Amino acid sequence: SVAVQLVKGIHSFSLLAIPFFILAGEIMGAGGISRRIIEFTNVLVGRVRGGLAQVNILASMFFGGISGSAIADVSSIGALLIPMMMDSGYDTDYAVDVTITSACQGLIIPPSHNMIIFAVSAGGVSVGQLFLGGMLPGVLLGMALMIISYVIAVKRGYPKGAKISFKEAIKIASSAILGLLTAVIIIGGVIGGVFTATESAAVACLYAFIVTFFIYREIPLSKMDEILLNALRTLATVLALLACCNAFGWFLAYLKIPALITGALLGVSNNKIVVLLLINLLLLALGTIMDMAPLIMITTPILMPVIQSIGMNPIQFGVMMVLNLAIGLCTPPVGAVLFVGCTIGKISMEKLTKSLFPFYAAMLAVLMLVTFVPEVVLFIPNLLLK
């Protein structure tokens, strides 16, 4: 029955990682970690032309590795850096473009709760391998965005950042290191076999709590009520979507829709390149009109037989799917990250979309690498999990 499928949709041990990662992200976002990451990345890349854009992208890479959420990234990093960039002479469209596209790194750089959703939807794909598989594509995405940002910054004549003394740099790095260690603990623990991906989420949550309230101490413990409420709101939305999408997936399977779509795609061509391009086009189109979590739940059972028939590794497919749908989050008409960025920057979606095309090109280039060069995804999992 439908009720049974609704319950089955959220009755999974792997899904326990999601509330812990959401809560860890909320705690560290509220406790000053985003500001410290910005200061730390400014030490690393702030002095180049358009330095604040490079800081924005690198900060998103680090923060995404903690929160695993693009919206959390834009809300915290963007709320600080978009006004800062505008005050420093950067155009509003450029500041928002850099922020929303770089936020997509958090969806593929571990930990990503969307990877966990894919793992469950795909029927037990290793979450640890998915986490490791997303590392190199996430870094490549960041590098591609940094190159595009630098080219535009030089063309528009944006300023360089101020020089930071060695003594000040050491002070900033030592202040940020505890927050950055969250991602190291998660990935290191999974690789070393100390704990599973689900257990790592609980450890990350406890570590975030200790660092925020007993070491950084920027906010009082009484703020925990608000943090828990925000995490609960996010979790309620995610779990409701998962439950309903599982029931929907059951209906699709009952009606043999996956088999029909597999036949339709392979009927166009049995060439692997053509089939992969068609799947990418399908996911990109769907990503512009639907949110990521339900799309993963709906499309994974449909497309997995197609992927298996052409011999693609499920880990590679998972990273490819999440990156596709991440692009959709900053694409109109229903890009959640795009909406948040426009709200912070006080700019219309129509004006912003025109200036986004060079950034879309960079993201699509990385997507093509992920799709057609398996080692981009599989190199690190094969190296570390032999």
Predicted regions and their residues:
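Alpha-helical transmembrane segments of multi-pass membrane transport proteins
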Residues: 1-386
